[in-house]
């Protein structure tokens, strides 16, 4: 530790600009009558996604001598959907999320997330609204849009929905990724590798890029597209090589959602990962009735970094992980 390690990594000027942008975001939703909510940062259940790693703690207060396991939330999604099912109407949240993963230029274990849900919207309507928010905060032009399939065909010349693993690995070889790709047996992991290395740096350079209709196997909590069951009603947003957001036309079928959670846990066990506790409160909320809606999660630290022309999230956050 040096004598200056107590100092914030962002300048006071940048922190003031950050506060201004957060105020603009809140005004954006207030003008649209979207309610701001707060949900727990800790939960008894957590995500089952094989790509997400959580922080775990334990409550040992009165009545819990043996301890009660808790997870810091990777997203407020599950709690917010319970509010939607309870009749909250359209809602948003600006708050902290936690992921026990990377720390670096675009990652901090504790970060600020904006998540919102719009009743009566599908993912295309939500993309329209997000486009308006991005133009406000980033002062950029309207976003370009492409399907996941179009992104692969236009940039890599390969169809992600139809090509065999052999062809996908050949594309990986042209990108210098043979050592990683050749032993890979999971199709989605290989597709994600090709997307992150081969496509992300080449889209959304002038204006943000919306990529939608991801493979059904990557649906997560999104509906399967009724017109093309090969794809899910899911989108992601990229700008200047950085992933900003992930959105869904939200799945409202409790049986299907529970089956996906269980399939995730089965895959976790196959991979030698810990099985995660399923959120049965969410399943009960879906059984009670989730209104037709779309939702999206947006990384605020990355958004503000881009808005202020910085190249590292440490320059727009006060105390990142090394100084926390």
Curated annotation (Swiss-Prot):
SUPFAM superfamilies: Class II aaRS and biotin synthetases. ATP binds at residues 99-101, 108, 243-244, 299. It comes from the Bacteria. Pfam families: tRNA-synt_2 (PF00152). It is an enzyme of class 6 (ligase). Its EC number is 6.3.2.-. One of its GO terms (molecular function) is acid-ammonia (or amide) ligase activity. Keywords: ATP-binding, Ligase, Nucleotide-binding. Coiled coil: none annotated. It catalyses: D-beta-lysine + L-lysyl-[protein] + ATP = N(6)-((3R)-3,6-diaminohexanoyl)-L-lysyl-[protein] + AMP + diphosphate + H(+). Substrate binds at residues 75-77, 117, 250. GO terms for cellular component: cytoplasm. One of its GO terms (biological process) is lysyl-tRNA aminoacylation. Belongs to the class-II aminoacyl-tRNA synthetase family. EpmA subfamily. Homodimer. With EpmB is involved in the beta-lysylation step of the post-translational modification of translation elongation factor P (EF-P). Catalyzes the ATP-dependent activation of (R)-beta-lysine produced by EpmB, forming a lysyl-adenylate, from which the beta-lysyl moiety is then transferred to the epsilon-amino group of a conserved specific lysine residue in EF-P. This is Elongation factor P--(R)-beta-lysine ligase. It comes from Vibrio cholerae serotype O1 (strain ATCC 39315 / El Tor Inaba N16961). The lineage of its organism: Bacteria, Pseudomonadati, Pseudomonadota, Gammaproteobacteria, Vibrionales.
């Amino acid at each position: 530790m040096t004598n200056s390690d107590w100092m914030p990594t962002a300048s006071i000027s940048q922190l003031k600009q950050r506060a201004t942008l957060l105020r603009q975001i809140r005004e954006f939703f207030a003008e649209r009558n979207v309610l701001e909510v707060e949900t727990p940062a800790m939960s008894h259940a957590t995500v089952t996604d094989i790509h997400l790693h959580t922080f775990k703690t334990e409550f040992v207060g009165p009545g819990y001598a043996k301890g009660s396991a808790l997870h810091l939330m990777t997203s407020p999604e599950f709690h917010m959907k319970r509010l939607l099912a309870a009749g909250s109407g359209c809602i948003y949240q600006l708050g902290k999320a936690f992921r026990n993963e990377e720390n670096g230029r675009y990652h901090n274990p504790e970060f600020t997330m904006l998540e919102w849900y719009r009743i009566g919207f599908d993912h295309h309507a939500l993309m329209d609204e997000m486009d308006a928010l991005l133009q406000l905060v980033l002062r950029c032009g309207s976003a370009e849009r492409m399907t996941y399939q179009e992104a692969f065909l236009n940039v890599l010349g390969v169809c992600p929905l139809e090509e065999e693993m052999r062809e996908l690995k050949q594309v990986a070889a042209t990108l210098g990724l043979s050592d990683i790709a050749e032993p890979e047996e999971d199709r989605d992991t290989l597709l994600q590798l090709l997307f992150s290395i081969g496509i992300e740096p080449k889209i959304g350079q002038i204006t943000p890029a919306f990529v939608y209709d991801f493979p059904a196997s990557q649906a997560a909590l999104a509906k399967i597209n009724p017109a093309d069951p090969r794809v899910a009603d899911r989108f992601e947003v990229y700008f200047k090589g950085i992933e900003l957001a992930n959105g869904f036309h939200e799945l409202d079928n409790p049986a299907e959602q529970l089956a996906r959670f269980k399939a995730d846990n089965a895959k976790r066990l196959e991979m030698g990962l810990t099985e995660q506790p399923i959120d049965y409160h969410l399943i009960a909320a879906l059984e009670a009735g989730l209104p037709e809606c779309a939702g999206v999660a947006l990384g605020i630290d990355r958004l503000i970094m881009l808005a202020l022309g910085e190249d590292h999230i440490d320059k727009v956050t006060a105390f990142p992980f090394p100084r926390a």
